[in-house]
């Protein structure tokens, strides 16, 4: 039980994060692991969506040329990140449907009036093989990181039982992904195929 008015939340507020050299040296996992997944092929002047199928839905990439957005609610807190097709913008949607990356039954809708701000997350770095972006200095990067952290809901930041911060797909992005999966499996969208995808 709690003694002297201490409980789990009280204690965790006093914990320090990242003590010792094991954090600094990335002990146990010194290499940055990553996987390259092709999501589009260049055909003449346009990008054609592509993907590799997997038996595990979480390993199937989101196809095509995409845009990433952060949605802030009326409290000025980040409520979700959203992946859209290249030609979509949440600012043009009266209702924003947030689809789960893999689960068809999981989705939620946000009215545009409930969104205070839509922030584009991508920046153009290279254009026609040339650098077109001026990289910020370390202090500017730190300031942006701090501002982003401040705009997270406290429930996402807490150490015990944190809320999950969602990254979702627009309805159009979800439909594109499902259509491509179905065509690669030789099935009709929305129906199960007896053919198993290659991993």
Task: Enumerate the predicted regions with their spans.
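Gly/Ser/Thr/Ala-enriched C-terminal appendages of enzymes
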Residues: 2-199
């Amino acid at each position: 039980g709690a003694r002297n008015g201490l409980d789990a939340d009280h204690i965790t507020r006093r914990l320090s994060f990242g003590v010792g050299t094991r954090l600094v040296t990335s002990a146990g996992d010194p290499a940055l692991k990553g996987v390259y997944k092709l999501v589009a092929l260049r055909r003449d002047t346009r990008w054609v969506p592509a993907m590799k199928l997997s038996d595990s839905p979480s390993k199937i990439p989101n196809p095509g040329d995409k845009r990433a957005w952060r949605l802030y609610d009326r409290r000025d807190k980040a409520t979700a990140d959203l992946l859209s097709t290249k030609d979509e913008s949440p600012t043009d949607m009266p209702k924003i449907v947030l689809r789960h990356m893999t689960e068809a039954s999981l989705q939620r809708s946000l009215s545009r009036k409930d969104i205070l701000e839509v922030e584009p997350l991508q920046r153009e770095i290279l254009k026609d093989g040339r650098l077109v972006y001026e990289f910020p200095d370390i202090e500017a990067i730190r300031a942006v990181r701090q501002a982003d952290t401040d705009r997270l809901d406290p429930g996402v930041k807490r150490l015990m039982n944190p809320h999950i911060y969602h990254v979702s797909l627009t309805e159009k992005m979800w439909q594109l992904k499902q259509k491509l999966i179905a065509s690669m499996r030789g099935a009709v969208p929305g129906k199960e195929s007896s053919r198993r995808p290659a991993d």
